[in-house]
């Protein structure tokens, strides 16, 4: 079973408070999401492998470490996931970026894939799928399905806020995927919103409904 990591770093929790605040405007909301994504990327990459190299300092030759050639990819779930990409790329600028677009079928209420674009070397990369919210888990499960059926073998899922129902759904369908969360909230309400949550992340990030 994949592990669930909840980040309690003070900076993440501080910024998350303002992300939740209904008084936070679009510009500040977007900036805060970007900043938290960077902080979470720092934590999520903690186990990247290193290799020793020789480097010439102004004083003498020295042994030091670099990341051991790991190929990484970031895949936002459209549209709200886009707001987390730049924050991650600040730390991992060489990562390739793919996209998964989903919409909810008005009759079945199930997510339907309408757009997928991934790096050509998908089988060789470790992917971080990002979406600010993990509510019912339907979109996350479908996005992970999309990556796996195209050859992805090593995937992590990262979100700002999750409901227990969403975590359970992802673990049920993708027990090999680790989940990284800034906050695990109480539950979903009758409309499928995370409680207490932060509202609709996409609407707040882009100023549109």
Curated annotation (Swiss-Prot):
Activity regulation text: Allosterically activated by GTP.
Domain of life: Bacteria
Keywords: Allosteric enzyme, Glycosyltransferase, GTP-binding, Magnesium, Nucleotide-binding, Transferase
Keyword Chaperone carried by entry: no
Documented EC number(s): 2.4.2.9
Cofactor note: Binds 1 Mg(2+) ion per subunit. The magnesium is bound as Mg-PRPP.
Protein residues bound to 5-phospho-alpha-D-ribose 1-diphosphate: 79, 104, 131-139, 200
SUPFAM superfamilies for the chain: PRTase-like
Pathway field: Pyrimidine metabolism; UMP biosynthesis via salvage pathway; UMP from uracil: step 1/1
Disulfide bonds: none
Enzyme class (EC, first level): transferase
Reaction catalysed by this enzyme: UMP + diphosphate = 5-phospho-alpha-D-ribose 1-diphosphate + uracil
GO MF term list: GTP binding; magnesium ion binding; uracil phosphoribosyltransferase activity
The keyword Cell inner membrane belongs to this UniProt entry's keyword annotation: no
Pfam families referenced in this protein's UniProt entry, alphabetically: UPRTase
Protein family membership: Belongs to the UPRTase family.
Biological function: Catalyzes the conversion of uracil and 5-phospho-alpha-D-ribose 1-diphosphate (PRPP) to UMP and diphosphate.
The protein's name in its UniProt record: Uracil phosphoribosyltransferase
Organism placement in taxonomy: Bacteria, Bacillati, Bacillota, Bacilli, Bacillales
Gene: upp
